[in-house]
Amino acid sequence: MRDTTRRLESGRPTWRFPRAFWTGNAVELFERAAYYGTFIALAVFLTDVVGFSDVAAGWIGALFSSSIYLLPFVTGALSDRLGFRPSLLLAFTLLALGYGGLAFFPTQGAVPFSLALVAMGGAFVKPVITGTVARSSDGASRARAFSLFYMMVNIGSFTGKTVARPVRALMGVGSVPLYSAFAALAALAITALFFFPRENGEERPRSVAQSLEGLAVVLRNGRFLALILITAGFWAIQGQLYASMPKYVLRLVGPEASPEWYANVNPLVVVLLVVPVTHLVRKLSPVASIGVALGLIPLSALVMSLSGNLQGPVRLFGATLHPVTVLMVSGIALQGLAECFLSPRYLEFASRQAPPGQEGLYMGYAHLNTFFAWLFGFALSGYLLEAFCPDPKVLAARGLSREAMAAAYAHAHYLWYAFAGVGLLAFLGLLAFALLPGRRENR
């Protein structure tokens, strides 16, 4: 521990970090496995198990997923005052209760309450873990620390969705949240036994009111807010892995499809490439690296849309695949590559803006781009699904013939055109951002 501290204080880049860093990353893996296991199934769960329409499910998913990125404005300040360890214990208790509620009480009245518990628990986890990463690294090693953190996030994401597929196939989509509840309990046990971070006792944390006042000052920084909104375009498309893709695939390919595993291509690509890409772009400014990501993300949506132009199965490496499968996987892989250029540099930039003792609050603000993206992307998804890729149960209830039902899906791929347009607008916005004077983000 002392050797690690000396290395950090030396100002030289290092891959060695204190125990709290590694323990925090371990529980982050379990939390992400729990979250993404349920998140990949949520859109289908809300319609097929709970009975909501596509539009209602889209709005519920939008409010749930976006609130996880809004609540840290409050929970970040609370975690700084309560301490990171008590905050994390509270977080995993809320998560276990929330996921358990989804599994045992899947009704339209109870599900929103259970999702609120999950959102509150997740909102505590985010600022605590990212704050721990920031406190456990110095300026010379911070990019490495966040690249390792982001790798663990994606390993957890990969694991959660990998397990969700057999759970859905063998026990039904309604049982997926039960798996997430067990993962949250495992994270709670690890936190209780092993997570003892060094608190910044010499710094007096702000109150919630003071933190919100500080947030108002930050929000008046037009350039940083513009960067938040521009990068939200990236995450609005990325969010369709959970909002649109599962229903799109299951409705066009059939129940034997594996949207959970298709979505896993994204974290697999990130795990394999995030460290080398971080090394590759280390001399680029944050805006230049983000620009590469925003150039790739609309292309990924266009690749997904090409399924509407292919007829019949595709033979690839000796296997016969549905064209939707081939193009979904290709587009998702491209999204993973784009994410490697965006996320580590973006988090690095945001963490460098944090004042002493306030990493939790400021890192919560850094994720505000995902708040806007999830709120917009999930809500839009519900309307696009209803228009171009409707629920087959709704069509059957209308008494449509087989031919009429097939015609209802003829333009399903138009959904991806809409999100390609969102990505293009984000890219053009970044170009304008880079050309305007006063580029503080390059510092």
Predicted regions span which residues?
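Intracellular juxtamembrane helix-capping segments at the cytosolic ends
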Residues: 124-138, 249, 341-355
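C-terminal ends and interior cores of transmembrane alpha-helices
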Residues: 93-107, 295-320
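Juxtamembrane intracellular "pre-TM" segments in multi-pass secondary transporters
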Residues: 2-18, 201-228
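Conserved MFS/SLC helix-loop-helix module at the cytosolic interface between two early adjacent transmembrane helices
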Residues: 70-106
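Short amphipathic helix-loop junctions that connect adjacent transmembrane helices
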Residues: 40-56, 243-260
